[in-house]
Amino acid sequence: MPPKKSSARSKQQQPPKQPPKQPPNIDPGSSFTPESFEKELKNLAARAKDETWARWLLEQGSVYLRSSLLLGLVAVYANVSELTLSPVYGSIPVSIWHDRLVMAACFVGWACNLHLGRVLPVRMAYLLPLIALYIPVAQFYLFGLSGTLTAYHGPLITEALTLAPLIVLSVACTATYLDGADLSALPGFMRDASPGIASYFYYRLVEKLSAGLLARYVGSAIFQTRVVMEAVLGASYALVAPSRLLAFTLPALLHTAFLNTHVMTPMATRSLNSTLQANDWLLHDRKESLTGYISVADNLKTGYRVMRCDHSLLGGEWIRYKGARVAEPIYGVFTMLEGVRLVEVAEPVPDSEARALVIGLGIGTTPAALVAHGVDTTVVEIDPVVHEFASKYFQLPSNHTPVIADAVTYTADLVNTTTDQFDYIVHDVFTGGAEPIALFTLEFLQNLEALLKPDGVIAINYAGDFTLPPPKIIVHTIKQVFPSCRIFRENQRDEDVIEKEKRDFTNMVIFCVKTERPVTFRRATAADLLQSRTREHFLVPKHEVSDKDFMALEEPSVLRNNDTAALAKWHEKSALGHWEVMRTVLPDVIWEQW
């Protein structure tokens, strides 16, 4: 066992004791106090927290702003695309596939956003301005194939090659942006589905609102015309997603500015006229308006003038054969409507004391004749451009009362606010391949009945296919309001055409009175004919229609405001048949070069 060290030696080896340390003497007013450090740390923490919230708000705001901009732009573009196709195919054929194509493109874009992001050589957003600005170019050349593509497949193929790629990439970009949305505040079962659901309803909202605004303001300025709106939307995409690829849009911009004859500029109109004149046509004027693309053109070879609305004709008159008092119409049905004056009544009214209400103007054939007879005539027309062109380019006299308004609203107001009644009512509103449903409902016809004098006469023009239910439904509804009617076709029934083409498309005029007495016509006098050769042949109706001429087997229903499905479901077939008829009236190139 080792020896113990002495305690004395241990004491000698211990270091001397140091006096206790005193805290530093810090001035209480200095910034280096513990309290100041603690305060500074708290300030830094608060600032970091504020910066985190600001960054979060900025990031989330960017996500939703970019998403809403892209969805809003493509929703508006979809509506403009429909408008752009309607002069070539008509609004109803364009609508057949439009919604289904849009929904399919939205689904593909949303489901394949990650795959598209991987396979495309550049960012998806950079391609959007290129597609948007090249759409007018593609449409311009695809319209030239409309005769081959037909009204059923043409709109589908055209929008599949133009609008669909834009929707796919716009929705794919939106889905990618919304992946960065912070949805932690939502319940777990809603986080995955809410971006898609919210995007769908937002798209539909913008689509609906923009459709209403476009219908109201289209054509009111150059920047509110179809092709220019497409160019403006393309430029908006360029602002949302700028890149060096924008240099490749220059050819598209140059084509739209200098070669696209669908642009409503004087230079484009002159270029269009050079094409039309090579086909023996001359364009006088054109405008875009709330009912469609309106134009006035002459057939130089045959010598007549027509007014066009989208893919339909509102009427026409001969310019080679001038009438002495009124124009000579190219369609006999408009002179048949003047036969409303020939219906025998108990107490005939002199023309100088008679009043007439005309619903739908067209080129003004019937109103002009009524005015020529001295009848006080009021014309209700919804489209101001139609009235402008009828007054400027056709022989519509100025001494009539024009009402630029919706006929449904106008007649309802007239019934509710005045006791005015008319001796004659002429109802002529067909256009675009289908009837405006609201103007053939029981409620609208009841308003017309209230506006007709007890001994008055109404003439209703309807164009349709007698092999389909709509004509039967319309006539059945009319007879619920007017107890005595007779119906006449414009042309005689052609059994060979019916057998070959399986359709019987024609104009018919329904003459009705408010009493039970039979509808009969007095003999036309020389004064009734207005020195017109056309009226000699067509003023007095000839080809009467019987119940057996309506070939649809279905029992007709009454068309009401809240129950129009029975008629609406046949619009597509009627419009497609009307498109084919119009392509036999004018050549393809005239419809395509609008």
Mark where each language-model region is.
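A positional/structural detector of protein chain ends, strongest at the extreme C-terminus
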Residues: 1-5, 591-594
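Membrane-anchoring hydrophobic segments
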Residues: 2-168
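Soluble small-group transferase modules, centered on the S-adenosyl donor enzyme superfamily
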Residues: 32-100, 183-193, 207-318, 323-332, ...
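Structural signal for the C-terminal ends of transmembrane alpha-helices
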Residues: 111-121, 177-182, 238-243
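Transmembrane alpha-helical segments of multi-pass membrane proteins
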Residues: 124-138, 159-166, 186-205, 249-257
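Residues at alpha-helix termini
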Residues: 153, 181, 216-220, 373, ...
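Intracellular juxtamembrane helix-capping segments at the cytosolic ends
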Residues: 170-177
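Soluble catalytic regions of membrane-associated enzymes that act on cell-envelope
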Residues: 280-479, 483, 491-498
